[in-house]
Curated annotation (Swiss-Prot):
This is Sulfolipid-1 exporter MmpL8. InterPro entries: MMPL_dom (IPR004869), Mycobact_MmpL (IPR050545), SSD (IPR000731). It comes from Mycobacterium tuberculosis (strain ATCC 25618 / H37Rv). Disruption phenotype: Cells show attenuated virulence in murine survival studies although initial replication rates and containment of this replication in the lung and spleen are identical to the wild-type. Inactivation of the mmpL8 gene interrupts the normal biosynthesis of SL-1 and leads to the accumulation of the precursor SL1278. Keywords: Cell inner membrane, Cell membrane, Cell wall biogenesis/degradation, Lipid transport, Membrane, Transmembrane, Transmembrane helix, Transport. It holds the Pfam family MMPL. The lineage of its organism: Bacteria, Bacillati, Actinomycetota, Actinomycetes, Mycobacteriales.
Length: 1089
């Protein structure tokens, strides 16, 4: 078989009724002529090289699927604001599992019962044992307060959030999710519960799994479409198979090379692999069509197969190289974008296009050499040239009409692109039958849409925020946030239940003061009679003390007589010194009886008139004025001794002495009388010593001092009575004022209920209880417990731990909204929340704080922001690259400008059709990745067709633009149509994917390619070229150096004009290209089918 293939065969000559021009010799210089000669001499070596390369890479390099699992693509760059804030919040609160969360939905349509709860607890226990894959678990077994939150209102479903290690979409997270899914399935099997896994981690897993399942189906669909189209174009099964063999080999090699790039750190997304397959098939088939069409042209000119292969490769290889370079450079430029899916798909597609290009200029010619020698890929008669020539004539005759009609269609369709609404919810790209979609449906059925998607207002400060002022400022900030439209509730340390803590409002605290004042006012009113009694009692006391003063003055003279008598007795007996001399004192008996009578009378009077001493002493004891006055204090001491003498029997002993003196009789023996008096007198002397009366002079002075103190007390009591009366009058007035104050404060409590009117204050002592580590409920003062609003200490500590970081420098608030967290409205709300929070910062304790919002809506918002930025970058970069290549190729300015404009309008029109089909007809929003990705591909591929069309027009316009347009449309129409159909078929093959984003992108790409093929390149651009005329090739003189032409040698004027203006039709159709003319080598009549 090999020998047969190696034998040269003679290719059939064209029809004899067609005159042909002799072929010019092909130049030997350049890469492609040398490459053509090598391939013709050694086709088996080239084929063996590709087979060996594929055979070497396939077993030694991991598959692209495996690499995509190891190196997944992160949606956002690592320095995205939301990711930075999330990491900071996670570090501040020492949490894990916030980046990647899966939600287990456990449901029972009959209602949750005891058996369901046992299954729930068993599942929780199993998950807690898996410490490698579960870093966070929010269950109501260990945290009973979560039961209400985690249970649906219809009591038919529970949710169980599970935090996984690693970032969302990372290899670690994916592997952990797979193992957690196995645990859930195993534990719930056989129970009455139905378990569904959903949440962000489940969505990412389903995206990857669905992409892998779709790939084989997509590749099969693309292959079938290509076979049909190639069979229609060539009508030859062998010719049809050659491009497929080339593409298949290049796909194997390209995937392994991309896998090597993945091992070097390039992220690989399953969606990117799908687009990579479609792009390789489309571009590879286009290049094969270019080469085979030029090969057929040379065969028609009488060349044998080997010569045709060399000439076709020499001429069209440069076109393929320029086209591939344009596409590859454009794709590689996407590495400067920010979003992961765009940043990684660019290098993947760039590598793929490069591999396809090398296969198209090496492997495909080698296959053509072997099959062409046997005549297996001979051309058939061209059936389309007459149609395209007629089309060119119509355009030249009525360029304005054609331009207006085509432009009107394009502009109307492009206008629809401005009505696009973009979707950032990856849930909608998944089919409804996957696990995560079923779980989301269960969530939507039983729970609010925003329940499992937390959104936080995160505040970071360089100072400790656990102060009354900082908390008051925080409350004012979140109060503003709570007023943002769509915000349903804000929960945090200052508002645990979603509204400002009532007991911390200053209006509530003022109301409590008012309540106490009201109670005091009522007490004053109730005890007004008692106050009046106080005033009367003070006046009565003052009157009585006046009477006491009179009694004291009278008693003082009597006491003085008693003291004189006792002093006389002491002098008479001589005290202890004269005890032995009493035997000679009988003569004194009479005097003693008389003295006894006097002592008895005076002692009795004193004893009967000391009743005034007790109240006076009590008044003096309670008088601060007497305590401060040394004289009054001394008198008080003496008066205390007098009262003590009365109470302890001293005065009674004096009376006993008097009675003994009175009982002296003549018949009594002196010894007995004196013996009795001796004992009584000794007792009296000791008692008087205790009273400080051992010295008669001292007693007299002290009695006088008491007299003075009593006088002063009587005078002060009157002043006291007047002061008490004044106090009573003031208390009555204060009671009236307290009533008015309490009424005002209570009214403030009742009416100042809005946060703006209420104020906020939490005592620092309460903060220390909330953030302390060893606080017990019984140690907290009752006034602080009153401020908790029904929370106990443990609950307060949990609230503080949830919303205040351990160091106090970070605080967060949980935001609940009425919006779908995946919607664009929720993304737009982020800016409003941030603006409201930052607007409350100036001139507060939060002035230097960093305020950010964390949550899925913020992730989607950042995705949108980066997408908009990347789209602008892609547009600018792609336009510049393609424009530069066109300027270099055409050596002109005007034509490249309107060509770029046509590309952009074509892209917008394709996007507009996508909006009409998906948004208006199917009710689906366009996926956010569609604009950027489709722009690059449509503009880059459109650049191929631009090169084919405008380069040939530049060549044919030597004899006039109008005739050049006719010849260009006639010669390139079939090639552009075939290439466009093949590329569109490759893109439409992606419509068989299950991912909505891939389906939308494929439809827009396929539609855009068809628009570009059948409208823009064949009607709009030729019409513009006719209207612009020779100005198409205008170039500033400074850009025209004599030898300037980087892609090849320029011809002189004589060479450009030596071709006859008119040729017979047959000769014109069969005339070969000038071998030394670069433009002719690129796009001459031989490029037709």
């Amino acid at each position: 078989m090999c020998d047969v293939l190696m034998q040269p065969v003679r290719t059939p000559r064209p029809s004899t009724n067609l005159r042909s021009k002799p072929l010019r010799p092909t130049g030997d210089g350049g890469v492609f002529p040398r490459l053509g000669r090598l391939i013709v001499r050694r086709p088996w070596v080239v084929i063996a090289f590709w087979v060996a390369l594929a055979g070497l890479l396939a077993p030694t390099v991991p598959s692209l699927d495996a690499i995509s699992q190891r190196h997944p693509v992160a949606i956002l760059p690592s320095d995205a604001p939301v990711l930075v804030s999330t990491r900071q919040m996670t570090a501040a609160f020492r949490e894990a599992g916030l980046q990647s969360v899966a939600v287990v939905v456990l449901s029972d349509a009959k209602g949750l019962g005891a058996a369901d709860e046992r299954s729930y607890k068993e599942l929780v226990d199993a998950l807690r044992r898996d410490t490698r894959d579960v870093v966070m678990l929010q269950d109501f077994v260990t945290t009973p307060p979560l039961r209400e939150l985690m249970t649906s209102k219809d009591n038919q479903a529970w949710i169980l959030p599970v935090g996984l290690p690693g970032d969302l979409g990372s290899t670690q997270s994916k592997q952990a999710y797979a193992r957690v899914a196995d645990i859930v399935e195993h534990q719930v099997a056989g129970s009455t519960l139905t378990a569904n896994l959903t949440g962000p981690a489940a969505t990412v897993a389903d995206l990857n799994l669905t992409g892998q399942r779709d790939r084989s189906r997509i590749e099969f669909a693309i292959t079938i479409l290509l076979l049909v189209i190639l069979l229609i174009i060539y009508g030859n099964p062998i010719t049809m198979v050659l491009p497929l063999i080339t593409i298949g080999m290049s796909v194997v090699v390209a995937q392994r090379l991309v896998a090597i790039a993945g091992l070097a750190g390039l992220g690989i997304a399953n969606q990117s692999i799908i687009f990579m397959s479609g792009m390789m098939v489309g571009a590879g088939t286009d290049y094969a069509v270019f080469l085979i069409s030029r090969y057929h042209d040379y065969l028609r000119q009488g060349a044998d197969s080997d010569q045709a292969v060399k000439k076709a490769l020499t001429s069209i290889g440069k076109v393929i190289a320029a086209s591939a370079a344009t596409v590859a450079i454009t794709f590689l430029g996407m590495v400067f974008t920010q979003l992961g899916i765009l940043k990684t798909v660019g290098p993947m597609l760039g590598i793929s296009v490069a591999v396809v290009f090398f296969a198209a200029v090496t492997l495909l010619p080698a296959l053509m050499v072997l099959t062409g020698r046997r005549g297996w890929i001979a051309p058939r008669r061209d059936l389309t040239r007459r149609f395209w020539r007629s089309s060119g004539v119509h355009i030249v005759r009525r360029p304005k009409t054609h331009l207006l009609a085509s432009a009107l269609v394009l502009v109307i369709l492009a206008g629809c692109a401005g009505l696009a609404r973009y979707n950032y919810d990856d849930r909608k790209t998944l089919p409804a039958s996957v696990e995560s979609s079923i779980g989301y449906a269960a969530l939507d059925k039983h729970f609010p849409s925003n329940l499992i998607i937390p959104e936080y207002l995160f505040i970071q400060s360089s100072t400790d925020l656990r102060t009354p002022k900082a908390l008051a400022d925080l409350e004012q900030m979140v109060q503003r946030v709570s007023q943002v439209p769509g915000v349903a509730m804000v929960r945090g340390i200052t508002r645990p239940a979603g509204r400002s803590l009532e007991q911390a409002r200053t209006s509530w605290q003022a109301g409590e003061v008012g309540s106490k004042l009201d109670e005091g006012s009522k007490q004053i009113a109730v005890h007004t009679g008692d106050i009046d009694k106080l005033a009367g009692g003070a006046n009565l006391m003052a009157s009585k003390l006046g009477d006491v003063r009179a009694q004291v003055n009278r008693a003082i003279s009597t006491v003085g007589g008693l003291i004189d008598a006792l002093a006389y007795l002491q002098d008479l007996l001589g005290g202890n010194r004269v005890l032995g001399e009493l035997e000679g004192a009988e003569k004194l008996i009479g005097s003693m009886r008389a003295l006894g009578d006097t002592i008895d009378a005076d002692a009795s009077f004193v004893a009967n008139n000391t009743e005034w001493a007790s109240p006076v002493l009590g008044a003096l004891d309670s008088s601060p004025m007497c305590t401060a006055d040394p004289a009054c204090a001394s008198a008080r001491t003496e008066l205390q001794r007098l009262v003590t003498a009365r109470d302890d029997g001293t005065l009674a002993k004096i009376s006993e002495l008097a009675r003994q003196l009175q009982a002296t009789r003549a018949v009594q023996t002196l010894a007995a009388t004196v013996s009795g008096l001796r004992g009584a007198l000794a007792t009296v002397i000791r008692a008087m010593g205790s009273l400080g009366m051992s010295s008669p002079g001292g007693v007299r002075s002290k009695i006088n001092l008491v007299n003075k103190g009593v006088n002063d007390l009587a005078d002060g009591s009157r002043q006291l009575a007047e002061g008490v009366q004044l106090l009573v009058d003031q208390v009555k007035k204060m009671g009236f004022g307290l009533g008015e104050a309490s009424a005002f404060l209570l009214a403030m409590k009742d009416t100042a209920t809005t946060p703006a009117m209420a104020g906020f204050y939490i005592p620092p002592e309460l903060l220390s209880y909330a953030t302390g580590e060893s606080v017990k409920a019984e140690t907290m003062p009752s006034e602080y417990r009153d401020l908790l609003g029904g929370l106990n200490v443990d609950q307060l500590k949990k609230v503080a731990a949830a919303f205040i970081s351990p160091d106090g420098h970070s605080i967060r608030y949980l935001i609940q909204t009425d919006l779908n967290p995946f919607s664009t409205a929720a993304m737009d709300q982020i800016d409003a929340i941030t603006a409201a929070a930052r607007g409350a910062q100036p001139n507060t304790a939060l002035a230097d704080a960093k305020v950010s919002v964390v949550g899925l809506p913020v992730v989607l918002k950042d995705t949108r922001d980066y997408s908009d930025h990347d789209l602008r970058l892609i547009i600018a970069m792609t336009v510049c690259i393609v424009l530069l290549i066109l300027i270099v190729l055409l050596r002109a300015i005007v034509a490249p400008l309107y060509l770029i404009g046509s590309v952009i309008v074509s892209y917008l029109a394709a996007l507009g059709i996508g909006v009409i089909v998906f948004q208006f007809l199917l009710g689906q929003e366009m996926h956010w990745s569609i604009p950027g990705l489709t722009f690059v591909i449509l503009v880059a591929v459109g650049a191929d067709y631009n090169m084919l069309l405008i380069s040939r027009l530049r060549e044919e316009a030597v004899l006039g633009v109008r005739s050049g347009v006719i010849r260009t449309v006639a010669s390139t129409g079939g090639v552009i149509t075939a290439a466009g159909l093949i590329m569109a078929a490759s893109m439409y093959g992606l419509v068989f994917a299950s991912l909505g984003s891939v389906v939308q992108g494929a439809f827009v790409l396929g539609t855009g390619l068809l628009l570009d093929t059948f409208l823009v390149r064949t009607v709009t651009v030729p019409a513009i070229a006719v209207l612009v005329g020779q100005a198409n090739w205008w170039l500033p003189s400074s850009w025209r150096p004599a030898t300037w032409w980087p892609l090849g040698r320029r011809r002189g004027r004589a060479q450009r004009t030596k071709r006859k203006p008119l040729l017979p039709k047959e000769e014109e159709e069969q005339s070969p290209p000038d071998d030394d003319d670069l433009i002719g080598l690129w796009l001459h009549d031989g490029l037709r089918l």
